[in-house]
């Protein structure tokens, strides 16, 4: 099932590091880690059944990797180490989608009922340990491999129309697809990535947060990741939901907003904990996952937060 991978030539050198070690590595939130998969539940491929299937022993979404809102019904989807969960509008808890415990590391909703993911399979399948890019068109109940099966593990996965960006942590490479994930090209990455966000007006304009053993920084590309300029030392989870609204949440839970694509940031508020995932919807609506599985929501650009969902 693997399709069209083209290699990039020599990478450029990284920017000079600041003197102190990256707090992202010290916190252990990011970096290149060993693959771990937890066995809970049944196989995921060609699964059927209701959106909301769970059991009394299900711990819920306690190790969150990604968030998405289905534009069809406004439901919040929570991608975790042990499966995909859904919290409908007006609900304060979430329920497992199907009965799979797939480790969904990368997750993005590109259109109504169309989800993209990556990560590691439920161990009761016969799939390889790296899922490459997978797609669901039934709200996460079943998934099909699209590309790079057995070859890539996208810990960062972002879509901008037909353009999809993925950071493959297993091979420390940034990849881009111009055809919704069917074929991929390896492009230059400025550093091992923490996160990436695309300009909602220009899919070739992206900002990335990167971190290495001794350095960290924010980088900007206007050619789809083929070249980069360093913008500063700030690093964190990113969301770019509207033009001129680039949000960053750092490792301490502080929320920042930039109106000039990351050159300058102003502090907005705090989420009250360490962030695990960030999602932007419109100019001022944000969702953030904490490491205990709590999902918070802000409707004022990160100044104040309320609890949207609990495990």
Can you describe what each PLM-predicted range is?
Residues 1-24:
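Terminal targeting segments of Actinobacterial cell-envelope proteins
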Residues 56-85, 102-106:
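Beta-strand-rich domains and repeat architectures in extracellular enzymes and scaffolds
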Residues 68, 107-108, 158, 197-199, ...:
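Conserved beta-strand position repeated across blades of beta-propeller domains
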Residues 83-85, 120-126, 171-173, 212-216, ...:
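Short glycine/acidic-enriched loop and turn motifs that connect beta-strands
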Residues 72-74, 112-113, 161-162, 203-204, ...:
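Short coil/turn segments that connect the beta-strands within blades of beta-propeller domains
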Residues 40-63:
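C-terminal region of N-terminal signal peptides and the immediate post-cleavage residues
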Residues 99-105, 149-154, 189-195, 232-238, ...:
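Short coil/turn segments at the loop-to-beta-strand junctions that recur within blades
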